[in-house]
Amino acid sequence: ECKYLWGTCSKDEDCCAHLGCNRKHDWCGWDYTF
């Protein structure tokens, strides 16, 4: 499970897709953590 500023996702891919992040890296910006 990953968490971000507006809530949580069951999958890391979902968070990255929602925030439009680069899936090749394990980060999604300051508002995203694993």
Swiss-Prot record:
Record carries keyword Plastid? no
Record's Pfam families? Answer: Toxin_12 (PF07740)
Protein origin, superkingdom: Eukaryota
Q: Which GO terms describe its cellular component?
A: extracellular region
Tissue localization of expression: Expressed by the venom gland.
UniProt main location, coarse: secreted
Q: Which UniProt keywords apply?
A: Disulfide bond, Ion channel impairing toxin, Knottin, Neurotoxin, Secreted, Toxin, Voltage-gated sodium channel impairing toxin
Per UniProt, subcellular location reads as: Secreted
Q: List the disulfide bonds.
A: C2-C16, C9-C21, C15-C28
Record InterPro entries: Huwentoxin-1
Keyword DNA repair present in the record's keywords: the answer is: no
The UniProt entry, under SUPFAM superfamilies, shows:
omega toxin-like
Record remark: domains: The presence of a 'disulfide through disulfide knot' structurally defines this protein as a knottin.
Report the family membership: Belongs to the neurotoxin 10 (Hwtx-1) family. 54 (ProTx-1) subfamily.
Say what the protein does: Ion channel impairing toxin that inhibits voltage-gated sodium channels. The recombinantly expressed toxin shows a weak activity against Nav1.7/SCN9A (25% inhibition at 10 uM), and shifts the voltage dependence of channel activation to more depolarized potentials.
- The protein in question is named Beta/mu-theraphotoxin-Pe1a
Q: What is the lineage of its organism?
A: Eukaryota, Metazoa, Ecdysozoa, Arthropoda, Chelicerata
